[in-house]
């Protein structure tokens, strides 16, 4: 590494309201699936690190649950705490918003970053979904007026448009430092944690509107047998009726959830996976702080 090309490295919080594409952006920058995604808000429930390594530097991305104003249930409060706690010790923040939309929760996310006293890059995601391309510039002017951003980047995380320029600008905000992680490392989370998240992703994708929010996944068994991973996953719900829905007629839905989860695990872990799944009931777990702690929520 020459003196003309210093290496930059630091922590970058990825903040925004639910469902703006924070996890899709994290995965795109890392170049691997470290954070689950779905079309439903609040898919991300845990703080995790995504490690994006480039010749010029390393971004340690702190992917967070979406910040939301309503905190009626314990789960919502826990996720908001995780999002706010992610700002401790970070060097910069990415405020991710959806092109054409700015509301109270976007303002909340901006205020949280501003109060942290770190440089903030505005990332305007989903520009490919704008029906009128001419509406982008007036929207950017509206959002940036009276708000201090270190840089503004319209992007499409899903299509990977605009990411190179974003990375260049974010690296400039980070200190000159050697990498914190090795080149092959992509996250601070264990395979056991990621396995549970991949099962939960399928629950978010395959179940109805409300039911995914009443489910969580606990990995009871994770063992290596040569090139075979043996994984046992418990899907927790809050009522017997929900259990029947997750299992489906003749066990069809649970079988589909398991099959798709297994394929995702094999792709991510680079190994064959033998996956068993069970569905169990723990009443009211999502509004019970003790239960949330037992299931690994921070």
Swiss-Prot record:
Q: How does it assemble?
A: Monomer.
Which residue stretches belong to region G4?
A: 125-128
Q: Where is this region: G3?
A: 63-66
MF terms (GO), sorted A to Z: GTP binding; GTPase activity; ribosomal small subunit binding; small ribosomal subunit rRNA binding
GO terms in the biological process aspect are:
ribosomal small subunit assembly
Instruction: Report the locations given in the UniProt record.
Output: Cytoplasm; Cell inner membrane
Location of the Era-type G domain: 8-176
Q: How is this protein situated with respect to the membrane?
A: Peripheral membrane protein
NCBIfam families documented for this protein: era, PRK00089.1, small_GTP
Q: Which InterPro entries match?
A: G_ERA_dom, GTP-bd, GTPase_Era-like, KH_dom-like_a/b, KH_dom_type_2, KH_sf_prok-type, P-loop_NTPase, Small_GTP-bd
Query: Gene Ontology terms, cellular component aspect?
Result: cytosol; plasma membrane
Task: Report the source organism.
Answer: Stenotrophomonas maltophilia (strain K279a)
Query: Which residue stretches belong to region G5?
Result: 155-157
Region G2, annotated ranges: 42-46
Q: Which HAMAP family match?
A: GTPase_Era
**Protein name stated in the entry:** GTPase Era
Q: Which residues form the KH type-2 domain?
A: 199-283
Q: The organism sits in which domain of life? A: Bacteria
Would the keyword Nucleotide-binding be found if you checked this record's keyword annotation? Answer: yes
| Family to which the UniProt record says this protein belongs | Belongs to the TRAFAC class TrmE-Era-EngA-EngB-Septin-like GTPase superfamily. Era GTPase family.
> What is the recorded function of this protein according to its Swiss-Prot or TrEMBL entry?
An essential GTPase that binds both GDP and GTP, with rapid nucleotide exchange. Plays a role in 16S rRNA processing and 30S ribosomal subunit biogenesis and possibly also in cell cycle regulation and energy metabolism.
* UniProt entry keywords in alphabetical sequence: Cell inner membrane, Cell membrane, Cytoplasm, GTP-binding, Membrane, Nucleotide-binding, Ribosome biogenesis, RNA-binding, rRNA-binding
| List of residues binding GTP | 16-23, 63-67, 125-128
Which residues lie within the region annotated G1?
16-23
